[in-house]
Regions:
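Class I S-adenosyl-L-methionine
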Residues: 2-10, 79, 85, 97-224
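Conserved class I S-adenosyl-L-methionine
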Residues: 18-27
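Glycine-rich SAM-binding Motif I of class I
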Residues: 29, 33
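Gly/Ala-rich phosphate-binding loop of Rossmann-like dinucleotide-binding domains
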Residues: 36-37
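Conserved SAM-binding motif I beta-strand of class I
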Residues: 43-48
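Conserved SAM/SAH-binding beta-strand->alpha-helix loop
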Residues: 50-52
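S-adenosyl-L-methionine
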Residues: 55-84
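Short SAM/SAH-binding signature in class I
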Residues: 85-93
């Protein structure tokens, strides 16, 4: 069995025993298998829309003799579960738009869901903002560097909190941790935004204003 990546190790660290989990987009099932081995009283539904990927997951689960802890299902998002089957959702490796689309399409399935753990590297402001709208707050966040890529992992819990634009953009918990990896991530974002602004064509006024706002936030927060 392949070793769990650093990225998925951080995702796994946010999961507790006695949880009823759906691992959406489980791919080869490595995260589900890791959790099933780690905890005694955990129930996992490993799902994927890709038949071949799920087939590999099924084989991996059988090799580890974990069929009693992990059930596999082929299908899209939350379509393949009932609300009483889950209290925790894990989604790792998808874009923010796709993730929010999955959750918004089946809001009735979230009634018993207390925890949602997400790893996404696209438009984290959009992700955080829409998770707040869905009735979840940011309980914890972590950064992890794996193969020279800095990944963001966020644990959302059911409840209400308000956040400023700055906190939704940078991440309120990441700001409070203020570690070297966060500064490195911000330095990279400053360089990326500066490059985009230098190359962007005339017009696109709203997009430019958004980029400039984000750049000001990054520069005012850190000396890079």
């Amino acid at each position: 069995m392949n070793k769990l990546s650093k990225r998925l190790e951080v995702v796994a660290s946010y999961i507790k025993d006695n949880s009823k989990i759906i691992d959406i987009g489980c791919d080869h099932g490595l995260l589900s298998i890791y959790l099933a081995k780690k905890y005694n009283n955990i129930k996992i539904i490993a799902s994927d829309v890709n038949k071949n990927a799920l087939g590999t997951a099924i084989n991996n689960i059988k090799k580890e003799n974990l069929e009693d802890k992990i059930e596999t299902r082929l299908g899209n998002g939350l379509d393949i579960v009932n609300s009483d089957e889950i209290d925790t959702i894990v989604i790792a490796g998808m874009g923010a738009n796709t993730i929010i689309g999955i959750l918004k399409y089946n809001t009735d399935k979230l009634v018993n869901v207390k925890t949602i753990v997400i790893q996404s590297n696209t438009d984290l402001y959009f992700l955080r903002k829409n998770m707040i709208k869905l009735g979840y707050y940011i309980e914890d966040e972590s950064l992890v560097e794996d193969s020279n890529i800095i990944y963001t992992v966020i644990k959302f819990s059911k409840g209400k909190k308000r956040y400023s634009y700055k906190k939704l953009y940078l991440g309120p918990i990441l700001m409070s941790k203020d570690n070297d990896l966060f500064k490195k991530k911000c330095t990279k974002e400053i360089k990326t935004i500066t490059m985009i602004l230098s190359r962007i064509e005339k017009g696109h006024l709203l997009y430019k204003l958004k980029l400039k706002r984000n750049l000001r936030i990054l520069k005012n927060r850190f000396t890079c």
